[in-house]
């Protein structure tokens, strides 16, 4: 079976041969003159023949991106499949797949093949703003700017290379139902994307991620030690002008003042 995919860095089309040999799936990349280090160093990629795959640590981020670009993500990867990324500050982040073809690409070309969020909360807690305000919602808040700057820069270079900007919908805050479109590389989930409904947030902030629609999937967050923590959502709290939505340690919907410290479980799309 031959699949044609677009290699975005060079604007050319490359071919992938997919075959089965000795009990493994073999992805054979045609890498002549393509200038992609991942392909040049590993032209043949063995994948254990377990489908869909749950542990993706034997694949590089570039290989995962290529499978998504070929339209094969859903049949190749399990919902909830995980991969670790060694960050530049020494933190080992683990990411899980929470959806396929869910997020709108910022360039208008369609849907991002795969959406991810962090399995355990990031090691540092952040506030959403320096002042107790949700004016401007996610689009204006300090945490969004830090996430797409400081936090993104700490991800491995390989992960940064495959993250695609997407459009995230969030209310304008200050008890408004107006929806702002934010272009993000890293983002927090909205209340609707996590719980599937608006509890303390304004309507129109995206759609329920497939992973969180499953029965027995917890909404609460754990830190790197396995302790439950209160996590931030990007949704402005609809009933006041000083808070953002959050998730309490029992997994219930809550809110906290924008100046409070809370756990981050960032997401991205590729």
Which residue ranges define each predicted feature?
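Short, low-complexity N-terminal tether/leader segments at secretion or assembly junctions of large
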Residues: 1-47
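Collagenous Gly-X-Y triple-helix signature in extracellular proteins
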Residues: 47-270
